[in-house]
Amino acid sequence: MSTAEPAPDPTNPSTSGLAPTTNGIGSPPPTASAATKFSILTKFLRRKNQVHTTTAQQNEFMQKYMPNGNSNAVQPAATGGQPASSDGGSAIEVPPPKESYAVRIRKYLANYTQDPSTDNFYYWTCVVTVAYIYNLLFVIARQVFNDLIGPSSQSLCRFYNGTLNSTTQVECTYNMLTNMKEMPTYSQYPDLGWSKYWHFRMLWVFFDLLMDCVYLIDTFLNYRMGYMDQGLVVREAEKVTKAYWQSKQYRIDGISLIPLDYILGWPIPYINWRGLPILRLNRLIRYKRVRNCLERTETRSSMPNAFRVVVVVWYIVIIIHWNACLYFWISEWIGLGTDAWVYGHLNKQSLPDDITDTLLRRYVYSFYWSTLILTTIGEVPSPVRNIEYAFVTLDLMCGVLIFATIVGNVGSMISNMSAARTEFQNKMDGIKQYMELRKVSKQLEIRVIKWFDYLWTNKQSLSDQQVLKVLPDKLQAEIAMQVHFETLRKVRIFQDCEAGLLAELVLKLQLQVFSPGDFICKKGDIGREMYIVKRGRLQVVDDDGKKVFVTLQEGSVFGELSILNIAGSKNGNRRTANVRSVGYTDLFVLSKTDLWNALREYPDARKLLLAKGREILKKDNLLDENAPEEQKTVEEIAEHLNNAVKVLQTRMARLIVEHSSTEGKLMKRIEMLEKHLSRYKALARRQKTMHGVSIDGGDISTDGVDERVRPPRLRQTKTIDLPTGTESESLLK
C-alpha cells in the first residue's frame, strides 16, 4: 500500500514545492548529493576491506553529514526488493567487495588438477630433472670435498706435520669454533676468511632451499595429477586425490621431503663448518620424474638415437663421479698423504712436487683414478692396506659389469642408427649384382648408382607407405592432408571438389624420382597416371627431343585429362606430348585406378570432374560435342560384366537350393502315396476274400464257416488330396 506523502515544509527546501533549481538565476551553489557522499564512503570502506555497509549505517551517515537531517534516510524495502527511500526512489545498490588475492589463490588451488600430457607439464619435468641432477652431483661432492663448503676452509685447516687426517681436521675445527663467543653471523667473524666462508655457506643453503621448493611444488602436482581412465583424462579433484593416496607415489614424495639436513646438519650453539650434505640422499629417490622426462624428450626429439647416446654418456659420467668421491673419501678417512695409494704428496701421480694442492686438483685426479679403474685399465698406484685392496677389487668387479652393459647398449644404439643405411646399402648391392649378372651396360649401371646416391642424399630411401603404415588410417590421412592437400588443390579439375574426395586422393599419391634425361611420358602412350611436380624441372620436347616447347616448374600438373576417360575427346586417352626430366625430378603420381576407385563413393564429384574436363577440352577445341557426355571405360565394362556374372551365379545357386528342396518334398510325398496305395491293396484283397471271391476271380468255399462272423472293419485312413497345378507351382517357388 502506498502511504500519503507528507505536507511540504516551506522551511525545508527538500520538501517544499519551491525547491531551488540548479540552473536558475540566483540559485544557491550546487552541493554534493547524498548519493555522491555515500559512494565515496563506500569506496573508502571497500578499500579498507570493511564489511558490507548496512541500511542502518547508511542512515547514520545521512543523519551525521547531511544538513537536512534524515529526510532522505534509506529504509528497507517492504517487499524484500531493493531498499527504497522516503520519496519512493530506489536506494543505491552496493556491489560486493572484490575478493583478495589470497582467497582467489586458495580457490584456484582447491580445484586445480594437472593434465600430464600438456607441454607445460613436460617443461616442469625438465625443471625437476635439473633439481634432481643438482642433488645427485653435489650431495656426495659436498660431503667429501671440504673446500666446496667455502673458499676459506682450505686456509683454515692446513696440513698438520705434512698430513691432514680426520683427527687433526676435527681438532682444527674445534679450536676455531671455540674462539667464537656467540652464534656466528656475517659481522661477528674474526677474519675475512670466516666471513667468506659464511657467505659461501649461505649460497649452498639458498640453492638447497630452491631445489626443495621445486620438490614441494612437484609433490603438489603429483597430488593433483590426472590419470587415464577408459581413454579419457580424469581431472576431478576428488578422484585425482583419491587415486594419489591409493598409489605408492605419496610415500616416495613424503620420504624425499624429510628435511634431515636441516634438522641434523645445523648443530647448536654453533654452526658446523662442514655440515651434513649426505643427509640429502633421500632426495634421490624421486627418480621416476627424471625417467619420465627422458622418455618424453626421446619421443619429442628428431634425433632419438643421438639422444640415447647422450643419456648413456651422462650415466657413465655420474658413475665415475660417485666413484671418484668415494675414492677421495676413503683417502681422507685413511689419511691424506699416508701412503702411495691415497691422495697426497706420497702419491706422486696425484700430487707431484711442482703442483699445488687445490680443490680442482683433488677432484680431477679422483675422477681420473675412477675412470681408469672402472674401465679396467688399471694404470694407477697399487693399494697398500687391506681396505684399499677391497675397494679396488670391488671397483674392478663393478666396472666390468657396468661398462659391459653400457658398451653393449652403445653398440646396439649405434647399430640402430646405421640400420637404415645398412638396409639401403643391401638393396643397392643387390641391384649391382643383378646388373652385373645380366650384363647391363656400364653407362646404365652408372645411372642406377647415381639414382641411389640421389635418394640417400635427399633422405628419400623410404617410401611414405612404409613409414606411415604403423599409424592408424585417421592419422595417416591427417599427415597426408597437411603434406599434399595444397599440392592437390593446384590441379584445375580438383579445385572445387569436396574435401572428402581430396582426403581420399591424398592417400593415393605416390612419390617417384626420375633421373636426368628420363622420359616421364611420350606422345601416343596410353595415359594411366597424372603427375604433379614436387621438385625439379621438366621439358616438353618434340619427337626428336631437340626442340623445347615449354619448361614445367615446381607445382606444375600434367596428364590429368587422360585419366578422366572423357567421352568425345579427340585424343582419347593418349598422351599428346613428350615430357623429359632435366635433372633429378620428384613427382607425385596419381593413377587412374586409384582415382576411379575413389570416385565410386562420390558420384556428384565424378560428374563435376567430367564437366570440368569437357570444358577444358572444349576450350582447346579437342572435344567432339556430338559424342555422349559419359563413356564407360574398359574397366567399368569389365566390372559391369563381373557384377552381372555374380548376379547370375547368385540366382543359379538359389535355384539349385530351391530345386533340391522341392525334390526332397516330392520324394516324401511319393513315399507316402506308395504306403497308402499298398494299404488300399491289402484292404481290397481282404474284402474280396470275405465275399468268396479270390483275387484271381475264382469262388472260395465257405463250408464250415460261421455265417454270423462279422466282416472286419475297415481302418479309417486319411484322404490325400493331390496338389493342383497352381499349388504345385507355388510349392516349387
Curated annotation (Swiss-Prot):
Binding, Na(+): 379
GO terms, molecular function: cGMP binding; identical protein binding; intracellularly cAMP-activated cation channel activity; intracellularly cGMP-activated cation channel activity; protein-containing complex binding; voltage-gated potassium channel activity
Gene name of the encoded protein: tax-4
Listed result of changing residue 421 to W: Cytotoxic; traps the protein in its active open state even in the absence of cGMP activation
Binding site for 3',5'-cyclic GMP: 559, 562, 575-576, 619-620
Protein name: Cyclic nucleotide-gated channel
Any one cellular-component term (Gene Ontology): dendrite
Amino-acid positions noted as binding 3',5'-cyclic AMP in the UniProt annotation, renumbered to this chain: 560, 575
Residue ranges of the TM segments: 126-148, 198-217, 252-265, 277-287, 309-331, 363-385, 386-411
Region (Cyclic nucleotide-binding domain) residue spans: 493-607
